[in-house]
Amino acid sequence: MRKSASLLAAFCVALAVFGFAAPASADVPSLSITQVGYNAYGADTIFNRNQEFVDVKNVGDASVNVAGLVVADQWAKSHEGDNDRNCNTLKVTSLPGVVTGADSSVMLPAGHTVRVYSGRGVPAVSAGGSVHTLFMNSHCGYHGHIWGNGGDTAWITLGANAESFAYDFDNGYTVKP
């Protein structure tokens, strides 16, 4: 009994000294950031902002409802409460090639990818129907380029679940986790 009381006391002291932090969120189930195109070829202009993108892939074995999925950079993530213009974010409400359910569900099939470009364009399906492209049409950042060439963090959030991929400049144009 004395040993148990001593262990409990030691645990309480450690908890008070070092604190306890529960994770703020869990990874987004079955979804992963698989690539970030962060550095457009040449100088950043409004004409090449679609060379910047984020790929979010369903790595699970079943379809995932991605309605409400938010793709954002670190600046947008840190300004969630005061980002009235929704700079540097895209919220999925539909996908090209996917029928939106009566309950507003947007089911991304297993193995399929959502590619979110920073610029403007027409949503489409490519790569044999497995890549669904969306566009932020960002008017924020430098000429609509939102991904930091020197490093940034890509975030995906779905409900209470969030995950991120941080990168640094590596003399390239795209990075993968």
Please report, for each region that a protein language model flagged, where it lies by residue.
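Activation on beta-sandwich/Ig-like modules and their edge loops
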Residues: 19-151, 157-177
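Secretory targeting and sorting signals
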Residues: 1-26
